[in-house]
């Protein structure tokens, strides 16, 4: 059993265009402000990492995230992970040049898994995060979705995670579509199932879980689950 030192909390900023947004189940997205101002606020409050996700880049092939990351990286001096619409080496390189420390990939790599290996070879596995948007579609079965929870992939999240790890990802971001934005607590069944997979396969990889936190007491439900390193809120 791996000994848990502490759970890290990192702010998750979901972006649409030039705005920070929030929604429920990754739907019904509403604007709540400027990503730059919120990033600076979280940094001033002691955040030691930021997760920034462009929620429409994969749908519309938008790449305005570069300028947003560039501005944030000049004001916020902690590691920044960026996801959304990363289709190739060029997109990834532009994010790194504009201040990203890690990138989170999802839609493009479900269609072209070899891209994971190409990114890991070019930038290092430690900088590649596999973003898995999980939705329950049967008893003890979760499917990986893409395009902010809109599109089926037909991929079992366990099989997909194992393939991603084999191809070279250095970290996993596991988001519960069913619980995201609901503030009703974490999807414990999903997280425990994923933790069991890591344990059974003897896989040691940083795991970020996201979706559902509504109060600090919700963290108590996670503390005794192995392999969780970080909570994105």
How does the language model describe each region?
Residues 4, 15-17, 21-22, 26, ...:
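Conserved anion-binding
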Residues 9-13, 22, 50-52, 80-84, ...:
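Hydrophobic faces of well-ordered beta-strands that scaffold small-molecule active sites
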Residues 14, 42, 50, 82, ...:
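Conserved, mostly hydrophobic/aromatic
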Residues 19-63:
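N-terminal beta-alpha supersecondary unit
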Residues 30-43, 87-94, 152-163, 219:
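Short, acidic/polar
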Residues 49-68, 107, 173-185:
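Glycine-rich, proline-tolerant flexible connector loops at the mouths of alpha/beta enzymes
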Residues 63-70, 113, 154-158, 184-193:
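Charged helix-capping and loop-helix junction motifs
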Residues 73-76, 80-103, 189-231:
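Catalytic cores of alpha/beta
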């Amino acid at each position: 059993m791996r000994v848990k030192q502490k759970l890290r909390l990192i702010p998750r900023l979901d972006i649409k265009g030039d705005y920070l947004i929030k929604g429920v189940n990754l739907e019904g997205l509403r604007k709540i402000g400027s990503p730059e101002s919120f990033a600076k606020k979280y940094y001033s409050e002691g955040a030691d990492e930021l997760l920034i996700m462009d929620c429409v880049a994969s749908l519309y092939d938008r790449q305005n995230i570069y300028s947003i990351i560039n501005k944030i990286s000049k004001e916020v001096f902690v590691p920044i992970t960026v996801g959304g619409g990363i289709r190739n080496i060029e997109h990834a390189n532009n994010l790194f040049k504009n201040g990203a420390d890690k990138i989170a990939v999802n839609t493009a790599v479900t269609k072209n898994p070899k891209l994971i290996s190409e990114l890991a070879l070019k930038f290092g596995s430690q900088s590649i995060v596999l973003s898995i948007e999980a939705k329950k579609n049967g008893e003890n079965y979760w499917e990986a979705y893409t395009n902010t929870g809109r599109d089926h992939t037909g991929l079992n999240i366990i099989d997909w995670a194992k393939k991603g790890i084999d191809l070279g990802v250095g970290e996993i971001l596991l988001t519960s579509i069913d619980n995201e934005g609901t503030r009703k607590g974490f999807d414990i069944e999903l997280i425990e199932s994923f933790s069991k997979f890591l344990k059974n396969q003897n896989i040691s990889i940083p795991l970020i879980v996201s979706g559902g936190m509504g109060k600090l007491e919700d963290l108590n439900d996670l503390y005794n689950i192995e392999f969780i390193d970080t909570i994105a809120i």
